[in-house]
């Protein structure tokens, strides 16, 4: 039986300071590598397997997402998913870009997912990294299922590679937990999440967070002149 509230612990995200190298890549099963649209040769030389990356990027089609797929020369044969982007893209575009790269990286058995953003200004780097972490958190959290055996997770954990500083991800994690809760509740069927169950969910969240909780019946909504809420409430048989 599915619980009404999901576990919101989320994926483990480990930042790794220092230059991206063969050792750090070898600790991942899949790696998402984001580069500028036209990466300079000097940048590619600093990245392990840069020669193979350059060759793969030459074969890409314009606008393809991902731009290239290759394998690292290590024991895990790390799948490297390369995406190219330009600074100044809107938040929605960055998230859409990140989701496409995540989809390409999670076709294999779940493992340690590496994420590296290289060759950008600090601001552009942070924006792209946040979008990729948000997409990974969304992809790696379970949703309600009605099967005897739960589907395997697509990601076990996340490592952020090639960082100059520890990223500020508290907001990204909080938004991911909120989005996960909303998606979870949306997917519960009406026979599981009826009016009373929804109220109990709201009360449980309020108790956990130390918030006040009050439930209004239709008579009270009429007194308050809350027409929009009243219209919704009148569609339910339970007052």
PLM regions: where:
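Short amphipathic alpha-helical segment within the helicase RecA-like ATPase core
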Residues: 1-239
């Amino acid at each position: 039986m599915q619980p009404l509230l999901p576990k919101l612990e989320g994926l483990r995200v480990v930042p790794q300071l220092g230059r991206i190298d063969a050792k750090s890549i070898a600790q991942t099963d899949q790696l998402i590598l984001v580069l500028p649209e036209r990466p300079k040769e000097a940048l590619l030389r600093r990245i392990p397997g840069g020669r193979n990356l350059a060759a793969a990027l030459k074969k890409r089609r314009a606008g393809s997402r991902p731009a290239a797929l290759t394998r690292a020369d290590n024991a895990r044969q790390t799948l490297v998913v390369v995406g190219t982007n330009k600074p100044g893209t809107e938040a929605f575009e960055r998230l859409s870009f990140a989701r496409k790269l995540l989809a390409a990286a999670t076709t294999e058995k779940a493992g340690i997912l590496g994420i590296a953003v290289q060759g950008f200004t600090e601001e552009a780097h942070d924006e792209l990294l946040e979008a990729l972490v948000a997409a990974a958190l969304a992809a790696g959290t379970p949703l309600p299922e009605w099967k005897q055996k739960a589907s395997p997770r697509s990601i076990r954990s996340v490592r952020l590679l090639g960082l100059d500083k520890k990223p500020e991800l508290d907001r990204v994690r909080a938004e991911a937990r909120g989005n996960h809760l909303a998606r979870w509740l949306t997917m519960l069927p009406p026979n599981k999440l009826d009016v009373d169950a929804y109220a109990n969910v709201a009360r449980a969240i309020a108790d956990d967070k130390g918030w006040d909780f009050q439930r209004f019946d239709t008579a009270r909504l009429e007194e308050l002149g809350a027409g929009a809420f009243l219209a919704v409430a009148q569609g339910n048989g339970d007052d």
